[in-house]
């Protein structure tokens, strides 16, 4: 536990499910004030809010589409209005879907890029704007992926969004380091989340993925949440501009680096 996270205001996009929800609960355990952004499932968001509160934190939910500039502006401003400030912005919302690249429509490409990359930029921009204007040494955490460095056949749009996120994060970190604002990525590997539930329910597919992970198992959302808590804490005060991979060593596995998966 990180005592300095108590009462910190943390915004999490896509915070009602999967990795986002696990992070929300972890910050609840840290007694933080959590702003849970969700896209369209209010019931799921309310469940996440309850879980955060039961863990020891405070929480509100805010509906919004991260591809819409006005929604992201509203999200950040709502956090500030409700809790008085902003300390940590976690850009977690993301989508993926497999399509052969020669069949990928522009609409599909744009949906993934707009959600994963543009949405993260908008969240970063609005948070940093507030930090700069109020002389706050704030923290931005972007949810990247092992695929910011590993090519992924059938997911060219997703890989492009995460590759772009890598350099976006590094650039923002360099630009705002003199102001004490830290910007980092988390790069999860294979995770037991709802987006992967169908795939990992198939024993053969699950075993195939596990065979590419040196640690031998698919990660738990709580393991990514622990990384987020560390990066948000003062224990990481000298850490900026990096991607911290939580992947069980997947990025070091030769056959996966060759494009398998």
Curated annotation (Swiss-Prot):
Disulfide bonds: none
Enzyme Commission number(s) from the entry: 1.1.1.47
NADP among keywords: yes
Residues involved in substrate binding: 145
Active site: 158
Catalyses which reaction(s): D-glucose + NAD(+) = D-glucono-1,5-lactone + NADH + H(+); D-glucose + NADP(+) = D-glucono-1,5-lactone + NADPH + H(+)
Top-rank lineage group of the source organism: Bacteria
Group of enzyme by EC: oxidoreductase
CDD domains recorded: GlcDH_SDR_c
Family to which this protein belongs: Belongs to the short-chain dehydrogenases/reductases (SDR) family.
NCBIfam families recorded: PRK07231.1 (NF005559), PRK08936.1 (NF006493)
Protein name: Glucose 1-dehydrogenase A
Source species taxonomy: Bacteria, Bacillati, Bacillota, Bacilli, Bacillales
Gene: gdhA
